[in-house]
Amino acid sequence: MNFSKLKFGATIGIIGGGQLGKMMAQSAQKMGYKVIVLDPNEDCPCRYVAHQFIHANYDDEQALNQLGENSDVVTYEFENISSEQLKKLTQLYHIPQGYQAIELLQDRLTEKQTLLEANTQIVPFVQIQTNQDLLKAIEKLGFPFIVKTRFGGYDGKGQILVRNDSELDEAYQLVEKQECVAEQYLDIQKEVSLTVTIGNEQQTTYFPLQENEHQNQILFKTVVPARSDKENEARKEVEKITRAIHFVGTFTVEFFIDKENNLYVNEIAPRPHNSGHYSIEACDYSQFDTHILAITGQKLPQAIELLKPTVMMNLLGRDLDLLENEFSRHPDWHIHIYGKKERKPDRKMGHMTLLTDDVNQTEQYMLMKFEGRDK
């Protein structure tokens, strides 16, 4: 794809005003662009950094058209917009990301089928439409396996681990509500991710391989560079994926590494990703900078420079009181508070990034300060 470069002062429309939209807007503004954001939440984080705010639901066709008509280019911060709605918008307005990635990836079944056809390494899976299919999953996958809903399921929601026959009842209940996918359970050594930006004329820029740790299905911390020898292999898997799915802008591929050191593609996020937030301080370009460069038709940097090894930790609602007490003592902590009005114990309220010469020591220090987060 080749499209004209946007001039300074042009307007970028963003569908979604959460923290990703906010950080996109901040990158866009420092490059001289104006920003309009559409979000159903009146107090969304992006509202207070955007030049214009449209308060509307994501399926409000009139509001989406208003966004398109007032923007020179439109992007989105998340994958749960209707692909049909997005397809209509792409026929009327300039949306470089298109709708294909959303159409394929918001459904776990079509995502896995696409990855399989692209010849990437994925764990065995079974489509689950009925309770009878769960019995087939036992035959094909064996215990344990994970049942996931085909749609939705952000931050681990809509997932059930089935370890034996006695745990099938909860899976049956989930399948009765909606179609699912069952995946073979992996004995995981490590989780890693690779953030990538594809720009004008399919120029590709890779960020360093990121090592991720989750707690209660929510990303806890990211270490960069990943302590793994799988970066080149991960890039080769991404190349297969980009031949199968149209991308423009920043996206992230999540991987599992099992105890035998085999790399498996887990899932794809077709937009900037939580594990790439460290890049704001730790790289010469952030994942949001390269996203804006891509969708505005600008040339991407040939390579991303990691300025220093880094640990990034998500800040949840339960962390904020401690953070307020400690912040003034730690000028080396790069703090981002997203501006969400309602504080919940397990809600992502911000993140902090520490550049360090000793990643292991920094990890231990953060765990000590935020005691209980490693439980």
UniProtKB/Swiss-Prot annotation:
Catalyzes the ATP-dependent conversion of 5-aminoimidazole ribonucleotide (AIR) and HCO(3)(-) to N5-carboxyaminoimidazole ribonucleotide (N5-CAIR). Belongs to the PurK/PurT family. Its EC number is 6.3.4.18. GO terms for cellular component: cytosol. SUPFAM superfamilies: Glutathione synthetase ATP-binding domain-like (SSF56059), PreATP-grasp domain (SSF52440), Rudiment single hybrid motif (SSF51246). Keywords: ATP-binding, Ligase, Nucleotide-binding, Purine biosynthesis. It comes from the Bacteria. One of its GO terms (biological process) is 'de novo' IMP biosynthetic process. It comes from Staphylococcus epidermidis (strain ATCC 12228 / FDA PCI 1200). ATP binds at residues 108, 148, 153-159, 183-186, 191, 214, 266-267. It is an enzyme of class 6 (ligase). Homodimer. It holds the Pfam family ATP-grasp. Pathway: Purine metabolism; IMP biosynthesis via de novo pathway; 5-amino-1-(5-phospho-D-ribosyl)imidazole-4-carboxylate from 5-amino-1-(5-phospho-D-ribosyl)imidazole (N5-CAIR route): step 1/2. The gene is purK. It catalyses: 5-amino-1-(5-phospho-beta-D-ribosyl)imidazole + hydrogencarbonate + ATP = 5-carboxyamino-1-(5-phospho-D-ribosyl)imidazole + ADP + phosphate + 2 H(+). Residues 112-296 form the ATP-grasp domain. One of its GO terms (molecular function) is ATP binding. This is N5-carboxyaminoimidazole ribonucleotide synthase.
